[in-house]
UniProtKB/Swiss-Prot annotation:
InterPro entries: AB_hydrolase_fold, Peptidase_S9_cat, Peptidase_S9B_N, Serine_Prot_S9B/DPPIV. It is found in: Secreted. The keyword Ion transport does not apply. It comes from the Eukaryota. SUPFAM superfamilies: alpha/beta-Hydrolases (SSF53474), DPP6 N-terminal domain-like (SSF82171). Keywords: Aminopeptidase, Glycoprotein, Hydrolase, Protease, Secreted, Serine protease, Signal. The active site is at 613 (charge relay system), 690 (charge relay system), 725 (charge relay system). Belongs to the peptidase S9B family. One of its GO terms (biological process) is proteolysis. This is Probable dipeptidyl peptidase 4. One of its GO terms (cellular component) is extracellular region. Its EC number is 3.4.14.5.
């Protein structure tokens, strides 16, 4: 069947934006304080997230009211009925999932956090007629890792002790019995949760509920990293710290192996399915998706170890035969795991079935239709812009709703594209700078349109094919009123042109009561990691950056610069950092600082840089350049040597240590001259309980600096006992920002040739 690749742009009327195309500056006189921005945010917009449900009427959803009760509401009529009264909600309820026919509720209680996404809990099933509760497992003790209704509601798959179980009204069946510290069934291990799946589950029901696909991870041979907890949530420290033994593969170390399993629920038969796309020791499974309306085909997106080759392997469930239906070579950089595969079915008059996915095979991330049986894909979108998310697939109307950077890489506008006509239609006025998102009802007839900035966010309800809102869901009127009392920093956006001709997105925040006749210190606030984005026209929280631009004793300008390697500007822009992390990113931040220093309102002698995580690493690489462009560096929870970080993230960008030894050496922070010469010194902050970027990074860096003779005048170090990567344990977060405020104040007041202790004037042998 022949398809035209001509992509039409629809001319239908789009929704107007009842907000200003820039961030608010307030209309009052009050300045934001530290307590209002860091300790407890005084002004913060809210938004609702609804769980759409399938009933006889489109537009119904379930939500938990402020009193704790569960209610069903028609978003169209606003009629509400109570599903579970507040006094019948289980004590200590953490989350809930509704049975497909609304007859029961699955509750999670007794929550205990594990890693970024995962947690342990008890689970209860509540009948909404009788309100009776029964435990999912009679002997549960806050140890269930995950639970999920089947699409038909006649079963619950859950994971306990790293084993998969299936509950039905009649009984509970244990599907696997080899789960343990090194074997994970149906849930990811640490590295798959953190770097690949980005979630706490690794099991998927078929659309008809007849089969369950799940992944099995084997950590045998994966090296262990020990994280000590000195206080361990006690008021008085125990004599010996608790030690977390975490299987954490670092660069070129053994990775967990992964295996696909299929379970037929009717018979209880479980079958391992070999995925031979790559050698078992090299194989990474990034995504599992059912490409069928029933249970005929399940597909896995497989990557090689360094994630620059990809194969989509389809499994015929009846025969268990496998077939590679799509393959990519991304050895010019890396291939992102976007978790966006979804079944479409036949299109047009053809009986051939398709699935949709986001791919940057054209050099820009776009929507493509791929044949389930394999073959040439069809481009649904194209151009020098990128699709950032698929929001909804409306099969009856043959439409895909998506977000993209079509207007600018710092913006997100909402569009639909028809796979029948190939016509792209904006749902909002995409000529107005903004960031949008949307949530579509179960039958696709309505959607909540969320405006996310740069002005104060709001949410309206729309019917499809209408540009008039049915009603406002969230107005954030209190925020609008609150801003009338304050005067806020002024946020602007612009681009810097590199000598290469490429451009960098910049977000500038000017202090309250800014005067072009004064000179202000500047704080750069980069993240800068591969594929990331900080410069966005979304609402900018009134946080620490707003505070330092408001406090009359600080009055810092802030610059946030998205360097080369960051996201949403095409594959070539992001992939040029491959195998040499830290080089181009640091060069771009230095270039931006040099441009800032030329501005008449910038105090060129006081330009600081502060970053967290990858931003902390980038800050170190900037200081290492010894450029003189920056006068102070603050590194929070930084990587200092990529050999210390996990394999699946690091090797995606740096490849293996064996193949790129020179690149790893160059990317590590080891040159000390910049640390000795930076005029205002460096502050390094890190949590000792960081299970992501280990404290080892800061410890090794500090030892390198001290051993090379960096003086106490130039180096300050702060650890946070038992804090993880977010640094919040026992008030660590507030302390961190107070310390940062103090250093910025000292830097602003620092004289270029001040008095110093005699130790700093001579070498110490």
């Amino acid at each position: 069947m022949k398809w035209s690749i001509l992509l039409l742009v629809g001319c239908a009327a789009a929704i107007d934006v009842p907000r200003q195309p820039y961030a608010p500056t307030g209309s009052g006189k009050k300045r934001l304080t530290f307590n209002e921005t860091v300790v407890k945010r005084a002004i913060s917009p809210s938004a609702i997230s609804v769980e759409w449900i399938s009933t006889s009427e489109d537009g119904d959803y379930v939500y938990q009211d402020q009193d704790g009760s569960l209610k069903i509401q028609s978003i169209v009529t606003n009629n509400t009925q109570t599903l579970v009264p507040a006094d019948k909600v289980p004590e200590d309820a953490y989350s809930y999932w509704i049975h497909p026919n609304l007859s029961s509720v699955l509750w999670a209680t007794n929550y205990t956090k594990q890693y970024r996404h995962s947690y342990f809990a008890d689970y209860f099933i509540q009948d909404v007629q009788s309100m009776n509760l029964r435990p999912l497992a009679p002997d549960q003790s806050g140890d269930i890792q995950y639970a999920q209704w089947s699409p038909t509601g006649d079963a619950i798959a859950f994971v306990r002790g790293n084993d998969v179980f299936v509950w039905t009204n009649a009984s509970t069946s244990q599907i696997t019995n080899d789960g343990g510290p090194d074997l994970f069934n149906g849930v990811p291990d640490w590295i798959y949760e953190e770097e690949i799946l980005g979630d706490r589950f690794a099991l998927w029901f078929s659309p008809d509920g007849a089969y369950l696909a799940f992944l099995r991870f084997n950590e045998t041979g994966v090296p262990t990293f020990t994280v000590p907890y000195y206080m361990d949530n006690e008021e008085i420290a125990p004599p010996y710290p608790r030690e977390l033994e975490l299987r954490y593969p670092k660069v070129s170390q053994t990775n967990p192996t992964v295996e696909l399993n299929l379970l037929e629920l009717r018979t209880g038969e479980r079958t391992p399915v070999p995925i031979d796309a790559f050698d078992a020791k090299e194989l990474i499974i990034g995504e599992v998706a059912w490409l069928t309306e029933k249970h005929d085909v399940v597909a896995v997106k497989a990557f090689n170890r360094v994630q620059d080759r990809q194969k989509v392997v389809a499994v015929d469930v009846a025969s268990l035969r496998t077939k590679t239906i799509n393959e990519r070579d991304g050895t010019d950089g890396w291939l992102d795991n976007l978790l966006s595969m979804a079944y479409i079915g036949p299109i047009g008059e053809s009986k051939e079935e398709y699935y949709i996915d986001i791919s940057d095979q054209s050099g820009w991330a776009h929507l493509w239709l791929f044949p389930v049986a394999g073959g040439e894909p069809i481009a649904l979108t194209k151009g020098e812009w990128e699709v950032t998310a698929i929001l909804s697939i409306d099969k009856p109307r043959q439409l895909v709703y998506f977000l993209s950077t079509k207007h600018h890489s710092t913006e997100r506008h909402l569009y639909s594209v028809s796979w029948k006509t190939m016509e792209i239609t904006p749902l909002v006025d995409d000529t107005v700078p903004a960031v949008w998102s949307a949530s579509f009802s179960s039958q696709g007839g309505y959607y909540i349109l969320s405006y996310r900035g740069p002005d104060v966010p709001y949410q309206d309800l729309y019917a499809i094919n209408s540009t008039a809102p049915l009603r406002t869901i969230t107005s954030n009127a209190a925020v609008l009123d609150g801003l009338k009392e304050y005067t806020l920093p002024n946020i602007t956006y612009f681009e810097l042109a590199l000598p290469s001709g490429e451009t960098l997105n910049v977000m500038q925040r000017l202090p309250v009561k800014f005067s072009s006749k004064k000179k202000y210190p500047v704080l750069f606030t980069p993240y800068g990691g591969p594929g990331a984005q900080e410069v966005s026209k979304a609402w900018q929280a009134l946080d620490f950056k707003a505070y330092i631009a408001s406090d009359p004793e600080l009055e810092y300008i802030t610059w946030t610069v998205d360097n080369r390697g960051t996201g949403y500007k095409g594959r070539a822009f992001r992939c040029q950092v491959t195998s040499r992390l830290g080089e181009l990113e640091a060069a771009d931040q230095v270039f931006a600082a040099q441009q800032a220093a030329k501005l008449p309102y910038v105090d060129a002698d006081h330009i600081a840089i502060w970053g967290w995580s990858y931003g902390g690493y980038l800050t170190g690489k900037v200081i290492e350049t010894d450029s003189g462009a920056f006068s102070l560096g603050v590194q929070t929870a930084p990587v200092s040597d990529w050999r210390f970080y996990d394999s699946m993230y690091t090797e995606r960008y740096m490849k293996t240590l064996e193949s790129n030894a020179a690149g790893y050496n160059a990317s590590a922070i080891r040159k000390v001259a910049g640390y000795k010469n930076v005029r205002g010194g460096v502050l390094i902050q890190h949590g000792t309980g960081d299970d992501n970027v280990h404290f080892q990074n800061a410890a090794a860096l500090v030892d390198t600096l001290v051993g090379a003779g960096v003086t106490p005048e130039k180096l300050q170090v702060q650890w946070f006992t038992d804090s993880d990567h977010g640094i919040r344990y026992h008030g660590g977060n507030v302390f961190l920002y107070r310390q940062l405020s103090k250093r910025l104040y000292e830097e602003k007041k620092r004289k270029e040739k001040g008095e110093a202790h005699q130790w700093s004037k001579k070498s110490v042998l």
